[in-house]
Amino acid sequence: IKKIIFVVILVAISISLLVIGNGYNMYKEALEQMPLSKKVASIREKENYAKIDEIPQIYKNAVISVEDHRFYKHNGIDIIAIVRAFVNDIKAMKFVEGGSTITQQLAKNIYFTQEKKITRKIAEVFMVFEIEKEYDKNQILELYLNTSYFGDGYYTVKEACKGYFNKEL
């Protein structure tokens, strides 16, 4: 029985290392195609880009409250949210809740697809560390609000304000 347990553990470790390696490669390939600084510069050059000081504080607070209430307290990964989501997904026996932070969502929005694959999630984690190393929380929030989908074809907070409320920021 000890041999079986050893083999199972060895297989689990091998699979984990393979998945992590594939995620790391996906992350590196994304950065090779366009480095983070260039990606951010291209986002900031867009016509409908809103700087953080243009966005009302009440709106920023609302987004943080709904999307990632520990945003200013973690390094881009919220272990508590991940565990909570995992437990709720297990209880429901399907994906019902996400544990992604604002930084993780930003990484996904600017580099990766929306598909639910573990390899993409691993790549996202590596990208989160890169983003958190290069940008402060307000810059991350600003980028997030300028790369998120708000529905009805609106991909920035400025577009959403104009489209939904016919108002400028």
Residue map of PLM features:
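Juxtamembrane regions of bacterial inner-membrane/periplasmic proteins
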Residues: 1-169
